[in-house]
């Protein structure tokens, strides 16, 4: 039962709850986010073990929804759903899980980044078709969101290192208050490409890409296809470095030939 799971993992859940309370006082502390992620991964593993052991339990789908389901576990959750009998999957909760899985799969690797027209801070129109020729790092964020502002430190490092030469860096804001967005760009000296989605969260492009949280980053290859999604922090920076190194190696081979 869910109650038994919560009691058995009471200490871990308490640590997670206490860690989340520290958010606004430690929003600039990268070690804080690493610690929180480790705790959340631990509860995910426990939930997976419980669901795998008792797929017919009515509690399993609740544990999946509450503790296991996220952008990185959709395939795992889908496989676990397949071994659950229909009577253990109430329609209302199953619909929510299926919708989440569908949204994440819409942004599967290899798909072309959908076309849309955005606005920069000067009010000029910018087409996503310009995200070509070199890899592009696209990050959805909002000026009012502490986690977004924290992630900007990592995006800044990527931009400072590659300067839109080998990697293009683009932010897409979901701000409602356009003036606050412009002020944040100036205050935080966000020098790279800054765009805003005029319809915020309601935009069809936002929904079609399955954006359900911010900050959220997608990496496009030079043809505009999705190469990687959902990375942040050190994982994002390491991936970009490896990607550039791989591209440089390929270019070097071409030159020799």
Where are these predicted regions, by residue range?
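N-terminal targeting signals for export/organelle localization
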Residues: 38-109, 257
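Loop/turn elements at helix/coil->beta-strand transitions in domains of secreted/extracellular proteins
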Residues: 132-136, 164-167, 190-192, 222
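Thiol/disulfide oxidoreductase modules built on the thioredoxin-like
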Residues: 190, 199-242
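Structural microenvironment flanking redox-active thiols in thiol-disulfide oxidoreductases
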Residues: 149-188, 200-206
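A non-transmembrane, solvent-exposed segment enriched in polar/low-complexity residues
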Residues: 1-45
